[in-house]
């Protein structure tokens, strides 16, 4: 678990994952500083914390396909957004992760 996630004391349940979207540059290519309202949500996010795991019909915990520290691709509308100490995070289900970026 990353230091950042440890200080948050957030433990997602089931097959949910706590991620932090990558920050978009606040300056456009031409050097213009963009206001927050002009920025778009990033599709890339870093995996910070894994949930307790999804269970199969026999009660066995299924392994996650992602690991802490992975950079993943998620839909810009995926998950539940939350703000803790001024930092924005998203809790998504593993099925909302479209790819792991290498």
Curated annotation (Swiss-Prot):
GO terms for cellular component: cytoplasm. Its main location: cytoplasm. It is found in: Cytoplasm. SUPFAM superfamilies: GroES-like. Pfam families: Cpn10. InterPro entries: Chaperonin_GroES, Chaperonin_GroES_sf, Chaprnonin_Cpn10_CS, GroES-like_sf. Belongs to the GroES chaperonin family. Together with the chaperonin GroEL, plays an essential role in assisting protein folding. The GroEL-GroES system forms a nano-cage that allows encapsulation of the non-native substrate proteins and provides a physical environment optimized to promote and accelerate protein folding. GroES binds to the apical surface of the GroEL ring, thereby capping the opening of the GroEL channel. Heptamer of 7 subunits arranged in a ring. Interacts with the chaperonin GroEL. This is Co-chaperonin GroES. It comes from Chlamydia caviae (strain ATCC VR-813 / DSM 19441 / 03DC25 / GPIC) (Chlamydophila caviae). The lineage of its organism: Bacteria, Pseudomonadati, Chlamydiota, Chlamydiia, Chlamydiales. The gene is groES.
């Amino acid at each position: 678990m990353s230091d950042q996630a440890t200080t948050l004391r957030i433990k997602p349940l089931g097959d949910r994952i706590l991620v932090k979207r990558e920050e978009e540059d606040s300056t456009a290519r031409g050097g213009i500083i963009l206001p927050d309202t002009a920025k778009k949500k990033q599709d890339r996010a870093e995996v910070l914390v894994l949930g307790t795991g999804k269970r199969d019909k026999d009660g066995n915990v299924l392994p996650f396909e992602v690991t802490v520290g992975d950079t993943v691709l998620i839909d810009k509308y995926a998950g539940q957004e939350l703000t803790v100490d001024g930092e924005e995070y998203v809790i998504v289900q593993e099925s909302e992760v479209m790819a792991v970026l290498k």
